[in-house]
From Swiss-Prot:
Catalytic activity: tRNA(n+1) + phosphate = tRNA(n) + a ribonucleoside 5'-diphosphate
PANTHER family: EXOSOME COMPLEX COMPONENT, EXOSOME COMPLEX COMPONENT RRP41
Domain of life: Bacteria
Name of the protein in its database record: Ribonuclease PH
Keyword vocabulary terms for this entry: Nucleotidyltransferase, RNA-binding, rRNA processing, Transferase, tRNA processing, tRNA-binding
InterPro entries membership: ExoRNase_PH_dom1, ExoRNase_PH_dom2, ExoRNase_PH_dom2_sf, PNPase/RNase_PH_dom_sf, Ribosomal_Su5_D2-typ_SF, RNase_PH, RNase_PH_bac-type, RNase_PH_CS
Quaternary structure and partners: Homohexameric ring arranged as a trimer of dimers.
Length: 258
């Protein structure tokens, strides 16, 4: 039994509040245990230079934390006059993950910018940002579709993420901060609703892990993500039927330009 009385294969309580911010084209508040992230989606008609004239869109993300999202105050990136390496790595991950679930041609020549702001951190902020970012991205796409700006709904797959790790020799799902800080192995998994992997990030902290342990972590993460996608589906309700209306084989894959 873990410190919060969960079993090793149990997710923290998840709550997603859709349309959390009034002015954004898409938004949500995602809560995974004590981790809370606000994500907004903004539609911008200016595409990156490598997409100009292509007829294709793009998804990008920014990530930051409130100074007191953690137990000790963190200095804002803007006060350091540069983006921290951690924030840069995380926002690239969020963008890559969500681009895997969209048809750029169907989106048209525009960008959806996802701003992920952590208001309380207790582990898994990047995976929560991806899972909640999908909902915000969905609602931005739905606005374009409902307003008849685009002809076809561009999201091809559900996308969600979760952390897994090994603590005290035990493989665990959805680590809180205390577990993450003492884990001998720490991994982040991103998958779609077809059971396909989008990204696997894994690190052994000062040791090594076996293939058997790796496969156990993958299976734990897969089961967790399936449950998270069911929560996403429930949050979207009937709207979720729009997903996959563009055939997957028409999807244009994107490179990681950011």
């Amino acid at each position: 039994m873990r410190q919060d009385q969960r079993s090793y294969n149990e997710l923290r309580p998840i709550k997603i509040t859709r349309n959390f911010i009034k002015y954004a084209e898409g938004s949500c508040l995602i809560e995974m245990g004590n981790t809370k992230v606000i994500i907004t989606a903004t539609i911008d008609d200016k595409v990156p230079p490598f997409k100009k004239g292509s007829g294709e869109g793009w998804i990008t993300a920014e990530y930051s934390m409130l100074p007191r999202a953690t137990q000790q105050r963190n200095v804002r990136d803007i006060n350091k006059l540069r983006l921290s390496g951690r924030s840069h790595e995380i926002q690239r991950l969020i963008g890559r993950a969500l681009r895997a679930g969209i048809n750029f041609k169907a989106l048209g020549e525009r960008v959806i910018i996802l701003d992920c702001d952590v208001i309380q951190a207790d582990g898994g902020t990047r995976t929560a940002s991806i899972t909640g970012g999908f909902i915000a991205m969905f609602d931005a796409c739905k606005k374009l579709y409902d307003d008849k700006v685009i002809e076809n709904f561009p999201i091809t797959d559900f996308v969600a993420a979760v952390s897994v790790g090994i603590c005290d020799g035990v493989e665990m799902l959805d680590l809180c901060f205390e577990e993450d800080s003492k884990a001998s192995v720490d991994m982040n998994l991103v998958m779609n609703d077809k059971g396909e992997f989008i990204e696997i990030q894994g690190t052994a902290e000062g040791g090594a892990f076996t293939q058997e342990q790796f496969e156990k972590l993958l299976e734990l993460g897969k089961q967790g993500i399936q449950k998270i996608i069911e929560i996403q589906r429930e949050v979207l309700g009937e709207d979720s039927k729009l997903i996959g209306s563009v055939p997957k084989d028409e999807k244009t894959s994107g490179c990681d330009q950011e």
